Amino acid sequence: MLNAQKLTLAVLISAAIISSAQASEQSEAKGFVEDANGSILFRTGYISRDKTNYVENLTGKPVQVKDTSSFAQTAIVNIDSGFTQGIVGFGVGVVGDGSFKIGANKNAGNNMIPRETGLNNEGVPTKGAGDSYDHWARGGANVKARFSNTTVRYGTQVLDLPVLASNTARLVPEYFTGTLLTSHEIKNLEVIAGKFTKDQYSDQVNTDGRHLDRAIVWGAKYKFDDNLNASYYGLDSKDKLERHYVNVNYKQPLANDSSLTYDFSGYHTKFDEGAFTYSQTTDDLSNRKNNIWAISTAYNTGPHNVMVAYQQNSGNVGYDYGENADGGQSIYLPNSYLSDFIGNDEKSAQIQYSLDFGKLGVLPGLNWTTAFVYGWDIKVKNVTDSAQEREFFNQVKYTVQSGFAKDASLRIRNSYYRASDAYQNGNYIGDTNEWRIFLDIPVKLF
């Protein structure tokens, strides 16, 4: 791990020395105000999960938990200044959200709405077990500096890194606080390095609700040409885990504007003794390891896109991500919908079909995606090594193409999920019918 960090630092230093390979981003800065941009995203979100065969983890007895739903409205603000002119440019940014629930939301959950401290099922006062918040606000500021083609940003940020990715699939995003350096000194090469010390999940008002001690990230992505790129990223989260990610993506152009896209991606994770996992089959908590990889092929022609994918786990624990302040969306793998198909030793296969109605000449902005994923050979400690799960997924999204409501979108998705009896424990998803409805209205301020 230390060698990987040293290599990243060496690449950054070398890149700075030879930065004349391309025009400097900083030399083209127009100014603090001139390059500024700001927007507000008004979002109405609804998530409903009907747990048709949920098993409570503490008692092992079946408990029917129906109409677990959350309904709320938010305004997500994103303001980012330009850089001052000069050899080194400086700027500031603000990200945040203000939200309120719609209705009582007595069965709120699904990481949508914060909850007060209340009594859990055993009558013990527990954070997040009480009533849902009526309204809440979160966010923070950040500062940034740029030299040549290298930018350093410190403060509250929404991250999009394969090993540390903010959850953006709920009402509001997950925020990390720390420092991220991004460098483009060498043409077609992006190098990143960073350190983060706070993690605020989507349904938390505490700026460090996930109690992150220290997470160091590093990595690089290189574009060989218009069709081939590869990347590597690493994460070292103190007392929690060490994770590595690799990806190779190749697009093969075909006749008649068609194409085949091949993708390989994978993670290796070693959990520290202090990490939380729920799918391990070993009693040695200091020796929990997981390898997960996936390959996919997608064929695109006109309005049609068909993808097939295969995903496989190995080790003595599943890919238990998101529970150790390692990002609620740190799963850049194809078989991820309601379920991620990341069980211990699990194998899964998927077929997906997408249709762009605009390219059919029917209704520009309308897209439909449907998929079926089947997982097998899941190990459940002291129970079985052949559990199964399956999911049938559908999503329709419409984006307004022009006029005063341009870029506003409505997204409706449904998942029909079922698992074998051995995979119904409360640590897992359990048989679920899920609906998600999101209405997004972006407003550009400047």
Each PLM stretch: what is its role?
Residues 1-33, 428, 443-446:
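Cleavable N-terminal export/targeting peptides
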Residues 22-38, 80-90, 133, 188, ...:
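Short loop/turn motifs that connect adjacent beta-strands in outer-membrane beta-barrel proteins
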Residues 30-31, 44, 81-83, 144-147, ...:
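Residue-level signature of outer-membrane beta-barrel architecture
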Residues 152-166, 191-198, 218-220, 226-238, ...:
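Transmembrane beta-strand segments that form the barrel wall of outer-membrane beta-barrel proteins
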Residues 192-209, 236, 257-340, 344, ...:
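Outer-membrane beta-barrel translocator/channel fold
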Residues 218, 351, 431-446:
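Outer-membrane beta-barrel "beta-signal"
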